Every structure is written in C-alpha cells, then in structure tokens.
Amino acid sequence: MIFIASATMGLESVVKEECLALGFKNIKVFDGRVEFEGDFKDLVKANIYLRCSDRVFIKMAEFKALSYEELFQNVKAIEWQDFIDENGEFPISWVSSVKSKLYSKSDIQRISKKAIVEKLKEKYKREIFLENRALYSIKIQCHKDIFIVMLDSSGEALTKRGYRAVKRLAPIKETLAAALVYLSKWKPDEVLLDAMCGTGTIAIEAAMIARNIAPGANRNFAAEKWSVIDEKLWTDIRDEAFSNEDLSKELKIYASDIDEKSIEVAKENAEKAGVEEDIIFEVKDFKDIESPAKYGAVIVNPPYGERLMNDEDIEELYRDFGKFCKKNLAKWSYYIITSYEDFEKAFGKVATKNRKLYNGGIKCYYYQYFGDRKNGYRN
C-alpha cells in the first residue's frame, strides 16, 4: 500500500526525515505531502509517532480524468469493499481542483460518491447504506487533471495531541511547534528558552521530543474502528511507544510570558502532556528575563500583524527583543517565526538563514540566527 503523510507547505522535508527515522520505505516528497510504502503496521506507526504531519491517508488511486464518466469509472474501479464495512460512513469530506478541466467541487463530490456506492452495492448486495458505523472519510484532490483519491486514517488532525486544555489567542499548531524545534537542531542536553511562550506549545513539544513521548499515543484515530486493521496493532504500537519514553534526562527548558492567564493554561497543558516537571514557567516580560545559561537556543512565536497587533507595536516589540537578545543572550542562537516583512530590520540583525512556512494559513518566515556554539549549547 501507498500512504500519504500530509504536511503544511514548507515542512515536507521535516516530515520526510520523520518517515526515514521510522523506517518507512520508498519515500517520495511532493508539495504538501510525503508518500511512502508499507503495511497497516506502518500506517498505525505513522499516526502515533509523526509529530509534524497533519494527517495520514491511504492513497487509494491516482489517475487522469477529463470527463465525469472517466472520473466515475476510475473511482468505481477502486476496491472500496476491501476497506469500507457494510454500515461504514464514507463521506467525501474534502475536494480540491486546480488548473483542471473538471473544476466543480460539488460535481466531483457527487459523481465520486455515486461511484463508491455502486461499487459497494456489488459487494454487499443492497441498495441503501445506513452509514452509521465507523468513519471512512475520503479526500479527493485534482491538479492539472490528475486526481488523487485518499482515505483518511487519522480522523481529527494529528495536531490534536489531547493536551491543549483551553485555547488562547492565536495559538501555534502543535505540528508546527514541533517542526520549529526540529529545525533549530536543539538537543535535549541543551538549554531552551521560549520568551513569549503563550500557552506553552513550543516548550511542551520540545519536552515531548526530548522525552521521546509519542504525540499520538494518548488519542484515538478514525482507523481504530476499521475492521480491516487488527486492534492488536494499535495496542502493541502504543505499548511500544510508552516503553520507549525516556524519563532519565534532566531538561533545561524555560518558558515565560507577560500574560498570567496564558502561563496558567500553559502549566495545565504541560501537565496533561506529562511534561510539567520538565519546564520552568514564569510570568515575566522578556525584558526582565535573566539569562539562565551562557549558551542556549531561543525559539519564539511572537505576536504579529494578522494575528494580534498593529505594525507600529510589532516593530517596537521586535526592536526591543533584538536589544534583549544582544544584551542578555549574546552567544545564544535565536529562532523566530513571524509574518512581519521587515523583521530583520526591526530586530537589528540579518538572519543566518530563513525558511518560508505557514502558520494557520499565514505566510511566515522562520528566521534562524546561529550563535557562537550552534552545534552545542552545553554550559
């Protein structure tokens, strides 16, 4: 089987590295997705272990269609009965069509649904399907007349780890937060600071990475209710994930924010994630932070225009943050994600490198400043 790990634009290479680390085979990278081959064990592992992917799909088919009749026949040719139970719910929950002859999303959805029903009629010898049991959500995307039909095994997006208690303003997705940590090359024996932590997502994801806590071990997935996958697979891989957790390391992760309520929520989130003892939370303006070490890494998702503040406030904030870093964290490495176009000017320093990413649909750049000891922040 071919599986698809979807990815936010800009994070495909990070998801690829995760897939390689999990031992998946024949990995291929495309815009917005990473494909790999495997069996149901790999599908379960992908859902439980991937930190930066949004969802995991089974790739049911890829074909060219220039007419609705071609679309119908190609969708009907898929062996749906091998996956969908007799009373399973099989909505076509998402359709996209770009630069294609067949562009009507509603027509693509209607024709494809009809094709699936006709296929299942042949298998189950019935005219009506109740669709009141396990969920088999179907996604169809078409680009330049090439259709990809996918079956969603995740259900809720993988960013839903299960630890976020209360949403505050403009939270960063857990999948993106984990990617920021990976891209920083931070190591668990190094100091980490998030000086504008909000509800603590970056610090929590860093602690989970350091502890090797699988992000999906404590949540459920749509495919757990599919009869085609042995329940024991889910149990065994979860047990494996729990046994692989590393509680031996002493972590030095610091997270602070000027908003007291955000820190309260951050502590609740950390407790739910099982890392409350690994992070030192403080209610504090970043200007008042004293350096916890000579070397370290700062990873922040500060407020920016489309989300929380106007340009004048943002420029002042970034200018002050640049001064703070230069004065208090002179030998540290800094990693800042923002959509503000003039960030480097306001911060007062040109980044060593930057990377285009998307945060909640907003185009951002991840500015990376390598410190004196970018390959090791040990003190």
What are these regions (language model features)?
Residues 285-288, 292-379:
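C-terminal catalytic and target-recognition region of SAM-dependent MTase-like enzymes
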Residues 149-183:
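SAM-dependent Rossmann-like transferase core, predominantly class I methyltransferases
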Residues 19, 92, 140, 301, ...:
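Residue-level signal for inorganic ion chemistry
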Residues 172-291, 306-307, 311-315:
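Conserved S-adenosyl-L-methionine
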Residues 41-48, 156-159, 375:
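Short, charged/polar, Gly/Pro-enriched secondary-structure boundary elements
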Residues 138-154, 367:
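C-terminal edge-of-domain segments
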Residues 1-134:
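Non-catalytic nucleic-acid substrate-recognition regions in nucleic-acid-modifying enzymes
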Residues 97-100, 157, 303-307:
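A short, flexible beta-alpha/helix-coil linker loop
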